[in-house]
């Protein structure tokens, strides 16, 4: 098994908290946090994955959140957490987003007040967009355009939620790493191409982005996106456990 996602837990496995999980093939799953309260040295099965599928995102939710999934096609779907019923650890989950065979989910977000969507494509172009431009609809659809994946841009390779003061790290397939302030990325509309964020060499491709959050003065261990820190739970790709 490979570690697919890692999160921090401070809610002491409360029965009113859930782990929401999304996979590359568009599956979404919600499981009560208490189901993971007794970890084993070999790990616990978190989701039953189809062959070739893998985990792309996890978060802790409380029954009141919205969920956003973003695909390599540059599309996004936003739906209420209550559209996903709670199910056991070994269940497969339900369809979160309908994808064409050549596309994958690349990110899952839990929209928060004050957050902006950062979307960056393979050729180094990207943008920030107000989350209010993405209305809440039912799960399972093909989604709406979050960024144009034109020939200039290439496919969407990274998406995250940014807050004031955050920085971002951009990483290419040739090992180039650029750190920049998120506030310097242009805020533009949903159905646009964005602007150049990182200049790449010929045949060089952007492969990953990472958000570097501004610590909170009140609680430096608390993230804006629901992954609060105290102890760690590792969700691994399932074994025969």
Identify the residue ranges that each predicted region occupies:
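Conserved structured catalytic cores and adjacent interaction surfaces
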Residues: 6, 10-144, 153-177
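Acidic, low-complexity intrinsically disordered tails
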Residues: 213-235
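Short, small-residue-biased leader/transition segments that mark boundaries at the very start
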Residues: 1-9, 236-239
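Intrinsically disordered, low-complexity regulatory regions of eukaryotic regulatory proteins
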Residues: 9, 202, 222-223
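Positively charged
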Residues: 72, 97-101, 144-152, 197-217
């Amino acid at each position: 098994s490979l570690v697919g996602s890692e999160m921090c837990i401070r809610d002491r496995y409360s029965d009113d908290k859930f782990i929401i999980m999304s996979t590359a093939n568009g599956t979404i799953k919600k499981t009560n946090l208490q189901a993971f309260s007794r970890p084993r040295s070999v790990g616990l099965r978190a989701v039953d994955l189809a062959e070739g599928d893998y985990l792309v995102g996890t978060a802790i939710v409380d029954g009141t959140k919205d969920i956003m999934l973003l695909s390599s096609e540059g599309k996004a779907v936003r739906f209420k957490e209550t559209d996903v019923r709670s199910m056991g650890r070994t269940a497969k989950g339900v369809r979160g987003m309908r994808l064409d065979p050549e596309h994958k989910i690349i990110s899952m977000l839990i929209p928060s007040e004050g957050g902006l969507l950062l979307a960056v494509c393979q050729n180094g172009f990207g943008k920030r967009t107000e989350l209010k431009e993405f209305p809440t609809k039912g799960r399972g659809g093909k989604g709406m355009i979050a960024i144009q994946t034109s020939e200039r841009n290439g496919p969407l390779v990274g998406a995250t939620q940014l807050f004031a003061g955050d920085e971002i790290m951009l990483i290419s397939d040739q090992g180039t790493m650029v750190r920049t302030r998120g506030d310097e990325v242009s805020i533009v509309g949903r159905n646009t191409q964005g602007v150049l964020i990182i200049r790449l060499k010929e045949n060089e491709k952007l492969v990953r982005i990472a958000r570097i959050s501004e610590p909170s003065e009140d609680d430096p261990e608390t993230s804006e996106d629901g992954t609060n820190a105290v102890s760690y739970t590792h969700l691994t790709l399932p074994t025969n456990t």
